[in-house]
Amino acid sequence: MIEADRLITASPREREEQQDRAIRPLKLADYIGQPGVREQMELFIQAARGRAESLDHTLIFGPPGLGKTTLANIIAQEMGVSIKSTSGPVLERPGDLAALLTNLEAGDVLFVDEIHRLSPIVEEVLYPAMEDFQLDIMIGEGPAARSIKLDLPPFTLVGATTRAGMLTNPLRDRFGIVQRLEFYGIDDLATIVTRSAGILGLPIEDQGAYEIARRARGTPRIANRLLRRVRDFAEVRGRGHITREIADQALNLLDVDERGFDHSDRRLLLAMIEKFDGGPVGVDSLAAAISEERHTIEDVLEPYLIQQGYMMRTPRGRVVTRHAYLHFGLNTPKRLGEQPSGDLFAVSDE
């Protein structure tokens, strides 16, 4: 199974970037959720504008699909400057980075997605550019080679990564602002869905937006993708209007259940319950049981299930929690009766 094939993947799909651009907020005032990040960035941007300076270099990290690219574009919009976008894997040689840096105007934003994937040789060129706004370039080859320094206009580097731990310390230390994006709550996601539906000219009821939001795995990108698929269903079977019932029918047809699990998630949990008595079970045995690759379980399926408290990693292997049994309407073994929950998105009935 390929992660990109799943409807509920947080990774971007082909052509999705262009679709998302149409509904992406351009101002902090329209940026929904992440209240701490929003308030801090508003303060930093106002201060930089008041001093007529470029914003400090900014690192944005967190799981995929939470709005790192959106926030980078908002920073440029709020600062009233242009943004140039690239990604770590694209910058293969120092010359690739130099070409971008020398074309920046004063105050511009250079956005580097997947910045943890920069090669060491490109990083070395980036350090003086970030710190001193200077570019060291080697002219010539062999004994005749010499280094010259080019002055760069002040600019803001905005780096985005899903793996902050993979950044080298020298690179991380050069960011004056570091922001972590967290998974969204259901209410904020419902607001995002309602806003996106309005931009798309799609009538939607509050309960319809909520139904989509609670199955979106805390991720705006997934929420907007589900909205587009529910729109297709509503236009054919619901007269173009999204109600809770229409959203529920559409998402059930798409095999996304009320917890945001798809067939692969449920198959993994059921295999652990039915074939291994809830665990512990080794990942290789589990992979053989469901005919998947080991890395698919570790990198694609496990993270969300662990984060939501439906399974755990232990020294003896993987085990399911009582929430997995309850999800399938099964009796919970007594040994699991007091297990703690890791559910991030649970909604209290009180």
Swiss-Prot record:
ATP binds at I23, R24, G65, K68, T69, T70, E131, D132, F133, R174, Y184, R221. Mg(2+) binds at T69. Residues 1-20 are annotated as: Disordered. Transmembrane segments: none annotated. Residues 185-255 are annotated as: Small ATPAse domain (RuvB-S). It catalyses: ATP + H2O = ADP + phosphate + H(+). Residues 4-184 are annotated as: Large ATPase domain (RuvB-L). DNA binds at R294, R313, R318. It comes from the Bacteria. It is found in: Cytoplasm. One of its GO terms (cellular component) is cytoplasm. Residues 258-350 are annotated as: Head domain (RuvB-H). The RuvA-RuvB-RuvC complex processes Holliday junction (HJ) DNA during genetic recombination and DNA repair, while the RuvA-RuvB complex plays an important role in the rescue of blocked DNA replication forks via replication fork reversal (RFR). RuvA specifically binds to HJ cruciform DNA, conferring on it an open structure. The RuvB hexamer acts as an ATP-dependent pump, pulling dsDNA into and through the RuvAB complex. RuvB forms 2 homohexamers on either side of HJ DNA bound by 1 or 2 RuvA tetramers; 4 subunits per hexamer contact DNA at a time. Homohexamer. Forms an RuvA(8)-RuvB(12)-Holliday junction (HJ) complex. HJ DNA is sandwiched between 2 RuvA tetramers; dsDNA enters through RuvA and exits via RuvB. An RuvB hexamer assembles on each DNA strand where it exits the tetramer. Each RuvB hexamer is contacted by two RuvA subunits (via domain III) on 2 adjacent RuvB subunits; this complex drives branch migration. In the full resolvosome a probable DNA-RuvA(4)-RuvB(12)-RuvC(2) complex forms which resolves the HJ. HAMAP family: DNA_HJ_migration_RuvB. Has 3 domains, the large (RuvB-L) and small ATPase (RuvB-S) domains and the C-terminal head (RuvB-H) domain. The head domain binds DNA, while the ATPase domains jointly bind ATP, ADP or are empty depending on the state of the subunit in the translocation cycle. During a single DNA translocation step the structure of each domain remains the same, but their relative positions change. This is Holliday junction branch migration complex subunit RuvB.
